[in-house]
Amino acid sequence: KMCIRDSFYLMEISNKLDANLRHFHQLLRVNENFDVVYRVIQIGGRDACVYFVDGFAKDDTLLRILQGFTSLKPDAVPQTAHEFSKLFIPYGEVDLLTDDAEIAVQVLSGVPCLFVDGYSKCFAIDCRTYPARGVAEPDKDKVLRGSRDGFVETLVFNTALIRRRIRDPQMTIEVMQAGSKSHTDIALCYMEGRVDQDLLSTIKKRIERLHVDALTMNQESLAECIYPHKWFNPFPKFRFSERPDTAAASILEGNLVILVDNSPAAMILPSSIFDIVEEADDYYFPPLTGTYLRVSRMVISFLTLFLTPVWLLFMQNPDWIPSWLEFIRLSDEIHVALIFQLLILEFAIDGLRLAAVNTPSMLTTPLSVIAGIVLGEYSVKSGWFNSETMLYMAFVTVANYSQASYELGYALKFMRVFLLIITAFFNLWGFVLGTVLCFLALVFNKTIAGKSYIYPLIPFSFSELKKRLIRTRLPHADGQGEEDR
């Protein structure tokens, strides 16, 4: 509202329609904005005007409400705006507003606002609708079994998907706004009695203190504003998910879920590294299968960090290779130093990934052929790369997609590149030092709630670690287990 207040002198809402029209025509810049529409109508012998944004209002609902005014007689119009709203606007969401800035924001948000001569209040009739796509399964967070719906860019649809799964009055959804220009809606979803109240109050205060024009990049902009962590710490402090079932499960566990309008992803906090590597498939399969998937994902993520640095260390010290690992030796002559091969491939893979994102779908297959055959096979034949280097980097590239977090994938990539460089320069001592620094980066890292990022490893808790590694059975009713046995 600050930007609107700074732009115009705002007066009190008048009970004279002409004064309100002059004021809001200037405030909303009706003559310049073709999509801001106003209609002057008659209600019981009184002049009235409704403002709305073309494309946001439900035409049939708004038309039905306005048609109900045509048959009103002058003696049937009540003296107060409250009585008028109660008698003649049969719609669930109607607010009586007197603040000019709030009315302007409501109109630009898609809420039709009605002014009636003789009333010093505005009727904000929430019959808006936003252009939205279907709640299809997200491309990133796919599952082998489970629900196939996903969040969209419309906030009310996303909150409805969560509310559908948690039908409990303790489930709370608070709405706040951020951005002096955009007035972006932010929903805080949590279970009363389970959420960390200190964390909740901290997040609310930080959102209220935001002084930005707009949340241009939605969640990422909000994350940077409410938690400005150090630039050299690559590990994500928030878990992002486009799945309503994942968000609902996190809320029931006592976490705070933040939804931002115009974004199809939910922010889950606080999140440790064990929370980030979890996926919905762990719970859509029986405990044994879920445990296998979870442990496999953790082991593969571990290998993406250490596979190429350990291989580089062995290639620099071939005498250390045991007999049962002879197959990892290079079979061809080295024309380019291994460290340069690995670093070039690290950047080349990111280049191919960016190219794939920006390539039209009809050209995806030709691009794959060029990347796989020309850049792969012929780069080995020409002597640029050794086949073993291509093999290990291919494994790292594919394994990086074993977990769904882009942020964690890039954090592991930065650590891997750091390990490669320090190992190439300082050999064994460099590898040991780099490993220790990576471990310390995790140890001294904290979640947004101030707890250990790698709990229950540090501080160690065997029972909690067991829950993180092993997918246990869901609790059953008393006596049901004995009957089943």
Regions found by a protein language model. Give the residues of each.
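Membrane-embedded alpha-helical signal segments
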Residues: 1, 5-310, 314, 320, ...
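Short polybasic/polar patches that bind polyanions
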Residues: 167, 208, 353, 380, ...
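Transmembrane alpha-helical segments that form the functional core of multipass membrane systems
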Residues: 258, 265, 271-419
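Hydrophobic alpha-helical transmembrane segments of membrane transport and translocation systems
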Residues: 387-389, 393-485
